[in-house]
Amino acid sequence: FQINSDEYGIPQARKRVIIMGIRSDLMSSGGPRRYLEKSHPITVKEILESMPKLRSGISKINGQSIKDSEDVWKKEVLNWFGLKSKIKDKEVKELLFKHFLPAIKKSSLSRGDEFFASSDYKKSCNNLPKDLKKWLFDPKLKGFINSSTRSHMDSDLKRYIYNSVHTEVYGKPPLLDDYPDFLQPNHANKKQGVHKDRFRTLDPERPSKTITSHISKDGHAFIHF
């Protein structure tokens, strides 16, 4: 039978087929579903807030490959301060320049790793539902595993920042027509109206459509809020 996995404590909004064998003498009119207990959906926000804050990497600036570092990344992100006059949306501008960028300026973020020790690991799952915490948390570990970020070129990084701030303001990601001119991608099919929502920020208040990862074919669709 088929279930919506996000209705059963799995932080992924996908339909899943489960094959379950039940002895005929235990079977009831309710079918196998009576053995499943629904739980409240686990949101993107709940999952990401239980993990350490990380920065992305940066791979290219103005088309030239560069060596990533926190200083290079932060300098490129903070270049937004010089673009203020190009942002016409007042609400996006206010959140971006009064809150988001000042927070980045004060931050000190790593990119994670296959494993990195952290004193925050023990309390990281405290706010998650008990069953999910039991599944994710291993007291023998002293840090986080398989939590690392990918690199992006500077133009995409700027689009991701604008996209996430716009999503915070309006509750939905911008379409291509909503971007300022200097953030418009140089895609051949842009004017054809194809994939106008190719850049999408995850809704923090809903389960993710997939376990988030930067995949070459759809990496723009899972921007973190």
Question: What are the functions of these language-model segments?
Answer:
Residues N4, T43-E46, M153:
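Secondary-structure junction/capping motif
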Residues N4, P52, I215:
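Residues at the C-termini of beta-strands that transition into short coil/loop
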Residues G9-K67:
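Flexible, glycine-/basic-rich loop-and-beta segments that form/coincide
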